[in-house]
Amino acid sequence: MGSREKKLLPLRKRSLEILARLKRLYPDATCSLNYSTPVQLLVATILSAQCTDERVNKVTPALFGKFPDAESLAIADLVELESLVRSTGFYRNKAKNIQGACRMIVTEFNSVVPNQMEQLLKLPGVARKTANVVLAHAYGINAGVTV
């Protein structure tokens, strides 16, 4: 074990202790976004930027009723997509990012939402927080803190 690893060991131990305490305090902590698939979680999380989960959950039934998967979102009419997500704010950027992310998922990831941080971060509209939410709630991978 190198000197850097020895220095990090107490921090790693402390992090695990904090995580254990949080799990005891919040044993039933879940994602409040409504979704059925990893792509729906990704889309809902993109929509949740600068918006409440409650508002997103009002928008997603119609959105996912019309466009339930990456394939349909990738080819959706952008104006129609914008109108469906308008009430979440920043709707033009969100619609563009959702469509771009879904196109990449279809073309580069065989229509499967990636389960690795590096790949998720390549998707338009996806930063670490969104990637952490998807990894944690769609795949059970705790790669960071999600709030």
Predicted regions and their residues:
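Catalytic cores of DNA base-excision repair glycosylases
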Residues: 3-147
